[in-house]
A protein has these predicted regions:
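Well-ordered beta-strand positions in beta-sheet-rich domains
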Residues: 19-21, 87, 132-136
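Hot-dog-fold acyl-thioester-processing enzymes
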Residues: 2-81, 144-164
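Short, basic and Ser/Thr-rich N-terminal targeting/leader segments
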Residues: 82-84, 116
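HotDog/MaoC-like acyl-thioester-processing domains
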Residues: 3-14, 95-164
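Short, conserved secondary-structure segments in the cores of folded domains
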Residues: 8, 54, 84, 89-90, ...
Length: 164
């Protein structure tokens, strides 16, 4: 049985980092649209998106925030982390087929409330920044090693979006 392990405030070191790489698919874009309710045609409609400044469908900017959130909650610090704030600057569009490497790096620790400040970034397959920012979390003080939950199964069905 697979487990997850956190890093407690005392274990975390300045400069410590965690990263994950994700390849963007049309299914990812559709799933994010469903979960967020953001059905802007720039994300879902090829014909509409072709007429935008990006010349095609783009991933939702906040998808980057969601992946950064997963790094914080699963890897560094991991289970038991309390997410306090996040700032993000979107540097360039992310399109289907892009491979984005997200990284969080500890830059500051505040002993009084067990606060950890992390630089956050996402870089595409060409080494170009797509997102930059900072996260502030309250790190766990107790060691946790929970069983890793199974990834949920999801089925996508295309449904016409009707404006009211």
């Amino acid at each position: 049985m697979a487990t997850m392990e956190n890093r407690t405030f005392d274990e975390i070191a300045i400069g410590e980092s965690a990263e994950v790489t994700r390849e963007v698919t049309r299914a990812d874009i559709s799933l994010f649209a469903v979960v967020s309710g953001d059905v802007n045609p720039a994300h879902l409609d090829d014909a509409y998106a072709a007429g935008t400044r990006f010349k095609g469908v783009i991933m939702h900017g906040m998808w980057s925030g969601a992946i950064i959130s997963s790094l914080l909650g699963v890897h560094l610090p991991g289970p038991g982390t309390i997410y306090l704030s996040q700032s993000l600057a979107f540097k360039r569009p992310v399109t289907p087929g892009d491979r984005i490497t997200f990284k969080v790096t500890v830059k500051e620790k505040r002993e009084d409330k067990k606060i950890v400040v992390l630089d956050c970034s996402g870089v595409n397959q060409d080494g170009k920044a797509v997102v930059e920012g900072e996260a502030v979390v309250m790190a766990p003080t107790e060691k946790l090693v929970p069983v890793a939950p199974a990834e949920p199964a999801v089925t996508i069905e295309t449904v016409a979006y009707v404006r009211k």
